[in-house]
Amino acid sequence: MVLNVYCCFFQISDIQTMKINQTILKEFILVGFSVYPHVQTFLFVVFFCLYLLTLAGNLIIMGLTWVDRSLHTPMYLFLSALSFSETCYTLTIVPKMLEDLLAKDRSISVTGCSLQMCFFLGLGGTNCIILTLMGYDRFLAICNPLRYPLLMTNIVCGQLVASACTAGFFISLTETALIFRDSFCRPNLVKHFFCHMLAVIRLSCIDSNHTEFIITLISVSGLLGTLLLIILTDVFIISTVLRIPSAEGKQKAFTTCASHLTVVIIHFGFASIVYLKPEASGDDTLIAVPYTVITPFLSPIIFSLRNKDMKNAFRRMMGNTVALKK
């Protein structure tokens, strides 16, 4: 009898504890860089400068493409779409991160967290697909130059970009719904500087291994699928370029593809580290910095530095600005 009462008492205690832990959470706390308190001010200055330069670079590319009619071609429309997507991608993550570097309150509502995650995944997926479409555009231009104007018009380009956004956000909505269908338990500490899906999944009240496996499978499949398509188009491009008789033609073709390949290597290289690294190795917060801050910063620089059309358009714009002032 005494033993039964004793067992009942502890069962009730366990149930009460479980109910407390499974209380519906209204907010998460982003741990972020609070584990590095001595360098937070330095990190704020560095990330803020990179943030401004990223916005400036992408806005210049979008502005030039919009203003200069010579850039109203599929190649630059894809580049402008990528710049717009990366600008939104940066705005989704960096402002909140900068705020948390200076603030003591690092909370984010559950709704805000789900929206941030959805936009982060959707825009990240859109970037991958647009990079793939840019490779396909170069493939058509180099391997099928006579049919290129018929196959890739500005209207087709717009339709492909819209499809990329739709596909990217369809996947992101699916992943976000899978994650937020479960309830979350305390402690509500997200060990990241934004609502990264793997960091949030681990706060689930139930065993999240199955959900984590599905999310990882979807993300890795998306990354590898788009990367394989890019590699395939590049193989055809290289084989075609090597058959071009003139050295000038080869150089022009390689220059056109070099910027795209560089961005692809950086983008997919940094993103793949998140899913291919061993679970217990390294700090997820530091590993996320390259693909959330550095990649969007480097992309406009790489695409603009060796691009003569962009340079000429920029000079014309600056010349027109100076002429108007006079």
Curated annotation (Swiss-Prot):
Membrane topology classification: Multi-pass membrane protein
* Membrane-spanning segments: 42-62, 71-91, 116-136, 156-176, 214-233, 254-274, 285-305
**Superkingdom assignment:** Eukaryota
Q: List the disulfide bonds.
A: C113-C205
Recorded GO terms, molecular function? Answer: G protein-coupled receptor activity; olfactory receptor activity
User: Any keyword Glycoprotein?
Assistant: yes
Keyword rRNA-binding attached: no
Family annotation (PROSITE patterns)? G_PROTEIN_RECEP_F1_1, G_PROTEIN_RECEP_F1_2
Pfam families in the record, alphabetically? Answer: 7tm_4 (PF13853)
Which parts of the sequence lie on the Cytoplasmic side of the lipid bilayer? Answer: 63-70, 137-155, 234-253, 306-326
Q: Where located?
A: Cell membrane
Q: Which InterPro entries match?
A: GPCR_Rhodpsn, GPCR_Rhodpsn_7TM, Olfact_rcpt
Keywords, alphabetical: Cell membrane, Disulfide bond, G-protein coupled receptor, Glycoprotein, Membrane, Olfaction, Receptor, Sensory transduction, Transducer, Transmembrane, Transmembrane helix
User: Major place of localization?
Assistant: membrane
* Extracellular compartment spans: 1-41, 92-115, 177-213, 275-284
Task: Tell me the protein family, please.
Answer: Belongs to the G-protein coupled receptor 1 family.
The protein's job, in short, is: Odorant receptor.
Instruction: Name the chain's protein.
Output: Olfactory receptor 10X1
Which species is this record about?
A: Homo sapiens (Human)
Taxonomic classification: Eukaryota, Metazoa, Chordata, Craniata, Vertebrata
Gene label: OR10X1
